[in-house]
């Protein structure tokens, strides 16, 4: 699992598919999916999206870059899906997060 975590951290801004990660690890795609979900409790794609959203969260706080620029930098091109997942994870919108962060400085 450590190898998978490292791979996702290093490549989160790139397109990561089940095919390329399972191939990289020399595993069958279906076996990889089952193994990952059994160990992590979530699907591999959900995990990749969480890693991306965590990186985006940090950039929203520590940079003044535009939201779309940040999301694309970290491999998230579907803005509607990003906003939905971000709000589920952090219970606020990216703009609200920035406002809160700027008020606490």
Language model: regions and residue ranges:
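Terminal helix-turn-helix DNA-binding modules in bacterial transcription factors
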Residues: 5-10, 15-19, 38-84, 99-105
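Helix-turn-helix
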Residues: 22-27
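The DNA-contacting recognition helix of HTH DNA-binding domains
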Residues: 29-30, 34, 78-80
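Non-catalytic C-terminal interaction regions
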Residues: 88-92, 98-100
């Amino acid at each position: 699992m450590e190898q998978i975590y490292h791979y996702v951290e290093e490549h989160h801004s790139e397109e990561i598919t089940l095919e390329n990660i399972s191939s990289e690890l020399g595993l069958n795609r279906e076996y990889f999916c089952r193994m990952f979900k059994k160990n992590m409790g979530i699907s591999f794609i959900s995990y990749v999206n969480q890693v991306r959203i965590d990186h985006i969260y940090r950039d929203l706080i520590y940079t003044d870059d535009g939201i779309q620029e940040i999301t694309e930098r970290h491999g998230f091109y579907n803005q509607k899906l990003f906003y939905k997942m971000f709000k589920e994870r952090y219970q606020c919108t990216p703009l609200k997060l920035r406002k809160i962060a700027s008020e606490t400085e």
